[in-house]
Amino acid sequence: MTRAACIVLAAAVLAGCSANNTPRTLYTWGSYEDLIYATYASPGKMPPEQQVEMLEKDYQQARAANRRMPPGWHAHLGYLYYQLGRTDQARQELLTEKAEFPESGVFMDRLLANLERPEPSRQ
């Protein structure tokens, strides 16, 4: 091999190594992980409305990129909808979680059953 060919080959190898080769993950996490951490680290600091807004924005970005949301994402959004009194949307998110992650079916069924029950009156 000539010296010029070796230089060209080395340049091609280095160019290939420097390309953005980060692996594509199975799910789009968006701000979900940070949001969950913030919710548990400082309860009550971030209102459900703000969390819903962040998650809905992440969902729109994921749909635009044809990506999936991670396990628990739809269930968490459903819980937030429930906190806001939007039970129809909560039900839909819990059903979506159950459909996308069948292993969560028993838990989602329990949450859906609780969604149907009226809250006990507080006195």
Label the predicted regions:
Residues 87-102:
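TPR/TPR-like (Sel1-like) alpha-helical repeat modules
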Residues 33, 37, 41-42, 105-122:
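TPR/TPR-like alpha-solenoid helical repeat scaffolds
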Residues 43-56:
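Helix-turn-helix repeat elements of alpha-solenoid scaffolds
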Residues 21-25, 58-68:
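Flexible helix-coil transition and linker loops at the boundaries of alpha-helical arrays
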Residues 76-77:
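Structural register within alpha-helical repeat arrays
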Residues 11-34:
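Bacterial Sec signal peptide processing site at the extreme N-terminus
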